[in-house]
Amino acid sequence: GYLLRHKKSGARIALLSNEDENKVFYIGFKTPPADSTGVAHILEHSVLEGSKEFPVKDPFIELVKGSMNTFLNAMTYPDKTMYPVASCNDKDFANLMHVYMDAVFYPDIYKQPNIFYQEGWHYEMENASDELKLNGVVYNEMKGAFSSPDDVLDREIVRNLFPDTVYANESGGDPDVIPNLTYEQFLDFHRKYYHPANSYIYLYGNMDMVERLNWMDEHYLSHFEKIDVEANISLQEPFAAPREAVKPYSITENEPLEHNTYLTCSMTAGDVLNREEYIAFQILDYALCSSQGAPLKQALLDAGIGEDIYSDYDNGTRQPYFSIVAKNADASRKEEFLRIIDETLEKLVAEGLDQKRLQAGLNYYEFKYREADYGIFPAGLMYGLQVMDSWLY
């Protein structure tokens, strides 16, 4: 593999040349949100609504219908936005690259304000007597996301662990805040972050890499001069003492209030740039909580703290974090939940972890990475997403 920098524009490029015919390309941008208007998410939707060389209403839908792609999507993360495609056909792959590069650098959003109103938010009323109501693709999508207890929990964990960083903001957009976003702010976000100097381009598979690099240079990258893009993602300063947060969430009329609380204990876990820690925490997660009869999970289940106990090691942010969650628990048992976690971990520190369980974790992850079976997703795509876990920082 090669890591390159385009001299004129400053674009970062990663090349993984191999025999895999399922070729993958993505272009990503560091997009730290300054608020919860969801501007990064709305922009992700909007750039795929037509561009300079592809002025059709919805090129994304045209590609879904007419391309031989093995993957086609765009994703907004807490601090980055990514546009990946994959195909086994050389001509199709080149076309997908063309559509996506044109979309991110020359979208129709500057000529067609209605793209913003359609994808972001707008007021509408059918008749003069009707009540004025809010609508918009991202607005409605995030209303759905904010009604899911699991999504609410994930969001609150990140917001409370990293209150002084960009992660305190909702990159997808908070439905209560999305209507604060103006069209001009939306365009400013594109002008600031969608520049090659702030881009991460990834090519994987069996292709003529030199030809692809020359094509990108000639058609797009050479049209831009390198600039400094301020997109710093700061680290959260450690707290002086553990903090507590309570977040209500809505339930249906038929759901009981009892045994319907989520209890979680979350902590930052090392540095995403430390590869050994990154792997060690995955194995620790397996040994402590994820595997059958894992000691931390078992201790909480034996105490009847919740109907389900699960853990999550998330390394998709500047600082990875580890969470232990008790689902369908009682709020009154919060102190007991924390005490069992502390006592179990202290005991494991004193007596050591079961070597067989650790070895099983090592074997599990070694097999997983060697097998590289990602189901419907191309292996090259999953490698590329993993690359961004550290490349971005």
List each model region and its residues.
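Charge-rich, well-structured scaffold segments of protease-associated domains
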Residues: 32, 46-240, 253-280, 286-393
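Secondary-structure transition/turn motif
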Residues: 7-8, 19, 30-32, 88-89
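N- or domain-start disorder-to-order transition segments that initiate the globular core
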Residues: 1-20
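Short acidic-hydrophobic surface loop/beta-edge motif
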Residues: 2-7, 243-253
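Short pre-active-site segment immediately N-terminal to the catalytic Zn-binding motif
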Residues: 28-38
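Ordered hydrophobic segments in well-structured contexts
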Residues: 3, 14-15, 26, 262-264, ...
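Short, conserved catalytic-motif segment at the N-terminal edge
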Residues: 21-25
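Active-site recognition of the HExxH zinc-binding catalytic motif
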Residues: 37-49
